[in-house]
Amino acid sequence: MTVRSALIASTLAFMLVPAPRALAQMVHNDVQVNPDSLIQAARDASRPFLDVNNAADGHYFPVLGCVSGQQDGAMGVHYLNGGYLLDHGVVREDQPEALLYEFRNGKATLTAVEYIVLAEDWDPDHPMQPPALLGQLFTYTSFPNRFGLKAFYSLHVWAWKNNPIGTFVDWNPTVSCDDAPTH
């Protein structure tokens, strides 16, 4: 094998192997072996907040207003626990960083939880490896982004409302922002 052909072969091999961040962006569907354990963990962690009036007791407060997609439905209104977000990259199934609520007819319904890890907290100790929770990989969102956040990893778990396109997909086509309050 010539040096030139070896260089071409190694370049092609490198191009065909997705980088961990690219993998984290691509793999967000139901790829874990047992999704029920993560769904149950998310329900256990968020059960006290089924009533949105209890969210503040858990230090969850509304941010961003209702997040909707251009074609893919919405996420809903995020209630964020800043302490969990700023915990230096700790991933715990019993401490979701955000609760997602859908508002319809003046009533808030808990639909999902979101686990969020800032890339600057995760990457130094876990180079080339996206976070995972109970086998489910997080997705990567670069900076700049529509949320105004630094680069981050996230994992949505539609624990309280069925998502027909996947339990761990970011957007839910059955969620709407039409009745959401403007914060």
Each PLM stretch: what is its role?
Residues 1-8:
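Bacterial N-terminal signal peptides that target proteins for export
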Residues 25-183:
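Primary mode marks residue(s) on the alpha4-beta5-alpha5 output face of response regulator receiver
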Residues 9-18:
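Bacterial N-terminal signal peptides
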Residues 19-24:
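Sec/Tat signal peptide C-region and signal peptidase I cleavage site
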